[in-house]
Each structure stands twice: as structure tokens, then as C-alpha cells.
Regions:
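A metal-dependent hydrolase metal-coordination microenvironment
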Residues: 1-116, 120-123, 129, 135-155, ...
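C-terminal functional module detector
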Residues: 1-3, 23-24, 100, 161-166, ...
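Short, structured coil segments at secondary-structure junctions
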Residues: 52-54, 130, 163, 182-183
Length: 263
């Protein structure tokens, strides 16, 4: 198990960002990320400028509609978002899945109309089994934001109903910021590739943090299981690991608020 840092929500001058594609990739390297996803609003035009020699990148898009924003990663063919409506989103998601993509709900409780039309998730998902991940933390301030608290509550409620959906962090990266404390999503992968990261997300093998990387495992009868695995009811030995210098320069114990560690 090797949890590596990624950012799954990025924009460039091909939509409303200030980065060129190259500048975004170089900024990601400077931020000690291992892989990013390029998710410009309603366009693939930046894909041809990606250079995986700078940093590996997942080809993605942010469906930006009047009823919410949906992140689509790794689709092998075009799926038209322009006819997405509140009551046909399940069919649109199935179309994405049919061409190899995964889908995530971006900032589900962001301020919506009339100030940010479409920013809040208003699609009527009937089959949550087809949703791969939810952005439970968005931008900075994390759990201090009510919109993030509500997103976390949504994710937790779906887990309680038996759905297997990954939690992710979304920086929603448009430009280089001079202030703020931003986190990332750690994915459990054996190699850095779009295929491996997407598989980890499908399996729920993600950790989000704005400081140290932390992971946990359970052990029973010589078998070790990690985040995203399913285990049977019983007695297990629990192990917890934290890497205080995993990504953020000079990260230390002061970055960890134990009451906010959620398993």
C-alpha cells in the first residue's frame, strides 16, 4: 500500500483558470503532488497540451450545468452533458461508465442560484451505486465551512445505507494562491497512472488531509485490510500510521486535529 498525493479538480486558461496547462503541471510538481486531473469546464481542449513527462495527468472534464457540477475522469469517448437534466442524470452517468469513465460530485453544497447558478448539486440521483466519489472537502477551511460539513454528512449517510463511494478533496485549482492552506487526496496505488488512480477511487481507497498523511489498517488471522476493503464482523487488531512530512513542507503535529480524523 502506497498512498500518493493527487489533485482531482484543476482548471486552466482553456476554461476559467489562469494557468496554462504547462504552468498547472509545473505548479503541481512544486506542490509535491504525484498526479493531477485536468478538469476544465465543458471542454477537452487542454488535453493535447498535457505533458506526462512533467507530471502524469488524468484526462477529465467538469460538467458545468444549471443543476450541478460533475467531474468525469478517464472517459474514452465523448458523452454530451448539454442535455443533462435533473431527472436523467442516472442515464448520463451510465453513458460515462459505458466508455470507461468515473464520476464524482463536485462541491455539492456550494452556493447556488442566484449568485452561482449551477454550483449546487440539484440532480436527482436515483442509483447512487454509479457515483464513484464525492468531493467532501472543497478548497480551504475544510470542516469550518458549512458547505463541507453538509457534503461530509451526505457522504456518511450514503455509506450508512450501504453504498461504496470514495471521499475526495477538491482544491478546484484555478491559479497560484499566495495564501491559504490546501490539502489533497491520497490514493492507494501501486503505480502512478490514470488507470491505477481511477481503480483506487472506484474501490474507495482514498484519504484526504490538509496536513500529514495518515492511513490505518486492520489485521486478523494473518490478513491485513486497508481503507476501501470490506471485512467481516469480528475482532481485529488496529494499526494507525501517520507521516508528518508526507507532502506539506515542515508539517508537524500541530497540523493534526484528532477530533477531525474521521474513519
Amino acid at each position: 500500500m502506497s498512498y500518493l498525493p493527487c489533485e482531482l479538480h484543476c482548471h486552466t486558461i482553456h476554461s476559467d483558470g489562469d494557468f496554462t496547462v504547462s504552468e498547472l503541471q509545473k505548479a503541481a510538481v512544486d506542490d509535491h503532488l504525484a498526479i493531477i486531473a485536468l478538469t476544465d469546464h465543458n471542454t477537452f481542449s487542454g488535453w493535447d497540451e498535457l505533458d506526462d513527462n512533467i507530471i502524469p495527468a488524468i484526462r477529465g472534464i467538469e460538467w458545468t450545468t444549471y443543476f450541478g457540477h460533475m467531474l468525469v475522469l478517464g472517459a474514452n469517448d465523448f458523452v454530451d452533458w448539454r442535455d443533462a437534466q435533473p431527472d436523467n442524470i442516472d442515464e448520463k452517468i451510465k453513458q460515462v461508465k459505458a466508455v470507461g469513465g468515473i464520476v464524482g460530485i463536485a462541491h455539492p453544497y456550494q452556493l447556488g442560484s442566484p449568485l452561482c447558478t449551477g454550483g449546487r448539486w440539484e440532480f436527482n440521483v436515483r442509483d447512487w451505486r454509479n457515483v464513484d466519489y464525492i468531493e467532501v472537502w472543497h478548497q480551504n477551511l475544510y470542516s469550518a465551512k458549512r458547505e463541507n460539513e453538509r457534503a461530509l454528512e451526505l457522504w456518511t449517510s450514503l455509506l450508512d445505507k450501504g453504498y461504496k463511494i470514495a471521499a475526495t478533496y477538491g482544491r478546484d485549482w484555478h491559479r497560484e494562491e499566495t495564501s491559504g492552506h490546501y490539502g489533497c487526496t491520497y490514493v492507494d496505488v501501486d503505480d502512478i497512472s490514470a488507470k491505477s488512480v481511477m481503480r483506487a477511487i472506484r474501490l474507495g481507497k482514498t484519504v484526504i488531509s490538509h496536513g500529514a498523511k495518515f492511513i490505518f489498517r486492520v489485521h486478523r488471522h494473518g490478513v491485513t485490510s486497508g481503507i476501501g476493503d470490506t471485512v467481516k464482523k469480528g475482532n481485529y487488531t488496529f494499526s494507525f500510521f501517520t507521516d508528518l512530512h508526507s507532502r506539506v513542507k515542515d508539517a508537524g503535529m500541530e497540523d493534526i486535529v484528532y477530533k477531525e480524523i474521521k474513519i
